[in-house]
Amino acid sequence: MILKKAIEDAYKHGYLGKNILGTGYNLDVYLHRGAGAYICGEETGLLESLEGKKGWPRLKPPFPATSGLYGCPTCVNNVETLAAVVPIIQKGGDWYASLGTPKNGGTRLFCVSGHVKRPGTYELPMGIPLRSIIYDYAGGIKDDRKLKAVIPGGSSVPILTADEIDVKMDFDSVAAIGSLLGSGGVVVMNEDTCMVKALLRISKFYAHESCGQCTPCREGTTWLKKTLQRVYDGDARQEDLDHLLGIAFNMMGTTICALADAAAMPVRSYIQKFRHEFEYHVKHKCCDVEAAVRV
């Protein structure tokens, strides 16, 4: 509704439509609402959806800038990117770049959720320590529990342990410790979080959202979900943990888009960093967290 009203106001005041401000230039803006498919966050999947087809990502090249919507050159940008354009135009690129680090300039929207006192979306300079985001802005861990793990950039990125939260939140620094800044979606987990349950929930999501176009993704996400469900239910064997890692390894880099990698990276990092919890589930057929919280 906000975007719709903004477009209507622009037409009303002559900033859109025919002969804009008497310049002879015409421009119309249309708003199309998607159905919420995760795969349509991939730019070519989005274009396919806009054309009325299945939201299946395209092989690239050609890239949208040369052949996009209906074969025409198309600019596809995230809202966060477009929102940064206005202050850059107003104050200049040097000013914007000075807000971050020398190699990662500007600000980033960090959407903090999970077991924190003040969940929310915070616009902060690139390079701010993850610890500061959690404790200074999000108020620390809810009920003053201990921190266990943090997803630094959305559900698809490798997880970080409590010992890694002094990392600076920019692309280079997060990559240097084996994760990704991704979308800036910070998910905080306290000491009572069952990591098996957390990973199972993520794997269910990716199995549901896979478009099914590529076999490694379609079959891989399904097998990850099924195997993790067995681990959580206490019906798995120890070798199933290595089987999960094998599936994840063979999914990465083998598909048209990055959804397979998005499903595989969490599996590899959760098992590598919290393998003892997965082994406990297999051996004792229950969770070693006494009062596992909802995740």
What are the residue ranges of the model-derived segments?
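Active-site loop ensemble at the mouth of alpha/beta enzyme cores that anchors a bound cofactor
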Residues: S49-P61, D163-L180
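Short amphipathic, charge-patterned alpha-helical segments
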Residues: M126-D144
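Terminal amphipathic helices with adjacent charged low-complexity linkers/tails
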Residues: I2-I7, V29, K142-A176, Q272
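Hydrophobic alpha-helical positions that pack around
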Residues: L3-M126, A138
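Short, conserved aromatic-histidine micro-motifs
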Residues: K60-P87, K146, I151, S155, ...
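Extended, hydrophobic alpha-helical segments in both membrane/secreted and soluble proteins
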Residues: L130-I133, K146, S210, L224
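Ferredoxin-type iron-sulfur electron-transfer modules in oxidoreductases and energy-metabolism complexes
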Residues: K5-T23, D166-V295
